[in-house]
């Protein structure tokens, strides 16, 4: 076997969706699929399909987004997620009761505490299987970037849900945190020109809109701040969510013409 073929074989093994998750977790996901609660959405690509080592931006849709993408994405992926959900059972229970269910989903605090006695252990099990990349709101964010770059170099794609959900989850996204822009910028400085896919998961329509990828180098030419770039991609994400069937058909037709 030549050196090139050996490297290609090793890369394929590293990037295999089956190798990206442990055996017990793959079995756990099969069980969840049998429940048929998180159905596979129809993926609508307005450009190239997902490629390895890319950055994927998506709306959150509460727990529906991460669960659906994990169950039905064939690409080897890593998710960004708040460190509280990756720091043990006690930390996760506190976060889910006080922040997720009470503040974001507006549950009664006592109901949230009772529900999370059952929900949190199951959620922690799922998050452990995800091999989540922890995110932070302080200087520890450097760890997030470092681990994410290592994942990209292994051929894994990183999925980020950057919306500000402090007031809850909305179909029309209100703002994006700019941490993912900083990540793409750092990759670029280290010689990695990240392909960035803006996507929108439409639960009601059962569609997953995937915009044509744009490399970070193209965004850098715009001379915008991180916040401005995040807002620009936020607007595009919302546009994807509002596209009519006619607009989708037109976009796909234009893509075909460009290829020709």
Report residues per predicted region.
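Non-catalytic C-terminal accessory region of glycerolipid acyltransferases
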Residues: 2-15, 137-260
